[in-house]
A protein has these predicted regions:
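Conserved GNAT-fold acetyl-CoA-binding loop/helix
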Residues: 33-54
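Acyl-donor (CoA/ACP) binding surface of acyl/acetyltransferases
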Residues: 1-31, 66, 70-182
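Short, conserved alpha-helical segments within structured domains
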Residues: 40-44, 65, 135
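A short helix-loop-beta-strand connector motif used in the catalytic cores of GNAT acetyltransferases and
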Residues: 53-68
Length: 182
């Protein structure tokens, strides 16, 4: 099934192959790639097309959902808001990146709010988590703003560009999400 959502300022839709150039440009920025778990730098030619095809297949199977964040006012792709799903455990993990020119404008928070709504209300998830490198406060501020609670820090949990990085984890259960709606 194909999902598409609108927020005040954004259209969230599945990625299309025509997005590849913008994905490579935005995600390939060294400052964006530096604090993400899987984005390479430099971003190789052809990698965006491969990634888009991979996430489209996963989205169609319901294993994960990767939404292109598109500004409604000008149609510009500005980032990615994804949610990996564990159907057996009714659990999901939120992950995202935003192109540097669009940092600090509330787009990630707006998209994350809509995607966790989708996770809890449409997919029936019981728990949604997210993680960020401790050196990326902008990312975990988004988690706080959408109501997630800090659950702990895993020291030296990932190896990024030859350096072990700490990850801070945030989470929310459905009952807490529902309380926020009252």
């Amino acid at each position: 099934m194909v999902y598409k959502f609108e927020t005040n300022n954004l259209l969230l839709r599945f990625f299309e192959l025509s997005d590849a150039g913008m994905v490579q440009q935005l995600a390939g920025n060294e400052e964006v790639a530096r604090t993400t778990l899987a984005i390479p730098h430099p971003y190789p030619d052809g990698a965006a097309e491969q990634w888009i095809e991979s996430v489209r297949q996963s989205s169609e199977k319901g294993d994960s959902y990767a939404f292109a964040m598109i500004k409604k006012d000008d149609g510009m792709l500005i980032g990615n808001m994804s949610m990996g799903v564990s159907k057996n455990h009714k659990r999901a993990e939120l992950a995202y990146w935003v192109g540097k020119p669009f940092w600090g404008q509330g787009y990630a928070t707006e998209a994350a709010q809509r995607v966790i709504q989708f996770g809890f209300e449409d997919l029936g998830m019981n728990r949604i988590i997210a993680a960020a490198m401790t050196k990326n406060p902008g990312s975990y501020k988004v988690m706080r703003k959408i109501g997630m609670k800090e659950e702990g820090t895993f020291p030296q949990h990932v190896l990024k560009w030859g350096t072990y990085e700490d990850l801070v984890f945030y989470g929310m259960v459905k009952s807490d999400y529902l309380k926020r709606l009252i």
